[in-house]
Structure formats: C-alpha cells, structure tokens
Amino acid sequence: MAKGLDCGTSYYITATEDSIKKQRNVFLTVDGDANQVKRMLKRQRIPFVEKAGKVHIVGQHAFNYAQIFSTTELKRPMSQGLLNPKEKDALPVLNAIIGELLGKAKGKETCVYCIPAKPIDQTREVSYHEDVLKQIIETYGYDVKV
C-alpha cells in the first residue's frame, strides 16, 4: 500500500487509501534535568527527541503543553514551507514527526511526498529540503517519490 506525505509548515499529514493522520509541525524545549524529563515523558507516552542534552516534546503534545505554560515558546522545524535554518534541532524533530506518522514500511511500500515549488521572487533553494525529507523517509524503509 502506498502512502502520501504532505510536509506543511503547520501540519504534516499522511494519507493511505483508508486513513488520514496528521501531526502538528512544532516542538517545545523542556528545561530541567534531561533524565527526569525523559522518564516522565516516557511514562505518559509523549513523543520527544533528545539532542545535545536538551529534550524536545514534538507535535500536538508540544502544542498542548505550550497552551498550559503560556510563557513557553513553541518552535517550528520549518519556515515558509522549507526547513527552518534558524532551528539547529529541526532535523531530529522532523525525523520524529515523520516516523510517528509513517511508521516502518511493510515490505516494498512507496511513500510519495510533496515539496514547494521554487519561488520566482526569492532566492530560496528547495533541493536541500527535498533531499533531507527523502533521506528521512528512506530510513523508515520506503521507496520514495516526490
């Protein structure tokens, strides 16, 4: 069965013949003792990424926590439809979001994903964005098509 992946700035959405899943494209860095934070998040089955000693809650859970703690800043791994160059932890966060939505491929499954067109009025490069997403999706065992 093939899967489709729409990599939007606000949401990532996957679709198959019979289902649609979406995940917010945001993350939240949690301050405090990383080991203690990870234990708490694991107990509550909240998806997170650890990078350089920092713990990041990803997706809808990050959004929910930000609503509770209003002084907390949500971050986006993408900006204007492309990878956010200002977020150094964007890649592991995107990997977690994509992995949660797609899961491991079953056999020779195909995943078709979309990227934005190269704008005519800006000097943004989409090929790096395309290559990074392809590489992430391939790590889950999919045959990838753009």
Map each language-model feature to its residues.
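Nucleotide/phosphate-binding catalytic cleft detector across ATP-hydrolyzing
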Residues: 1-55, 60-146
